[in-house]
Amino acid sequence: MQNQKIRIRLKAFDYRLIDQSAAEIVDTAKRTGAIVRGPVPLPTRIQRFDILRSPHVNKTSRDQLEIRTHQRLMDIVDPTDKTVDALMKLDLPAGVDVEIKLQ
């Protein structure tokens, strides 16, 4: 796998889960001899929702809710076959979305 790069993008609602998962990926990649760049924190996406409190009247009384999506980006430069196998066997928490691209 010469001159290749693995780009890993993590998304989660809980920043503690995403930081823990990023640390596991970095440790696994470094243990197999690959060079890791990152994790780079990307901007947090915030979605806000306004919900009416009352089912009938009082339009001015509302609740405001928000969902925060945290993101991290990592590059693994010159991965070996051991690196790819170790990353495939890695068990990450259920709340973390992982996107892997080979470049």
Swiss-Prot record:
Top-level taxon in the UniProt lineage: Bacteria
Task of the protein: Involved in the binding of tRNA to the ribosomes.
InterPro entries tied to this protein: Ribosomal_uS10, Ribosomal_uS10_CS, Ribosomal_uS10_dom, Ribosomal_uS10_dom_sf
Name by which UniProt lists this protein: Small ribosomal subunit protein uS10
PANTHER family cross-referenced by the UniProt entry: 30S RIBOSOMAL PROTEIN S10 FAMILY MEMBER
Subunit structure: Part of the 30S ribosomal subunit.
Family of this protein: Belongs to the universal ribosomal protein uS10 family.
Keywords: Ribonucleoprotein, Ribosomal protein
Gene Ontology cellular-component annotations: ribonucleoprotein complex; ribosome
Any one biological process term the GO annotation gives: translation
